[in-house]
Amino acid sequence: VDVEACKSKGIAVGITPNGVRRPVAASVLTYILALSGRLMVKDALVRGGPSTFAERAQHMGTGLVGKTLGSIGLGNIGTEVFRLCAPLDMNFIAHDPYIDPTIAKSVNVELKDLESIFRESDFLTINVPLGEETRHLVNSARLTLMKPTAYLINTSRGPVVDQTALVTALTQGVIAGAGLDVFDPE
């Protein structure tokens, strides 16, 4: 929503971050579970008809215990993601230059620099608003920092991720996969 254009025409715009906090965080958790369990691949195998045990065994997925969940952004949604994921026994890291460190501590999150989040995360969730400093925050250079076994999850805003760079990273095996519910253009 172009807030400035709305203001200039006398149109009120309301932002309700608590209204979507839990549903968006639940979506992130759903992506984590689906990606780690290779759910989409398993679905395709089932829909494709009978498959062998060997074919299915190649897509068993990975456990989450001890894996690192990283977040770029630790506001209402980011903190809720960590609250929901607490029972999964993962390591939590985040980058948010605007957050009070006591908030990070309250959800057992270690704050780190941006590049470390890309390097260390097994699952990286994006939880930032769209602005000039966040447009294409996830770009080719940062995607190449990620582990080839890592997954990117974006439920924030589409233009935060350079989609051309993401497609390249996925097709070249730079990262293992992605879960998106936002795209560019939105």
Question: Language-model features: where?
Answer:
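Short beta->alpha connector loops at strand-helix junctions that form conserved
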Residues: 10-22, 96, 114-115, 156
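Phosphate-binding beta-alpha-beta segment of Rossmann-like dinucleotide-binding domains, i.e.
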Residues: 17-68, 83-84
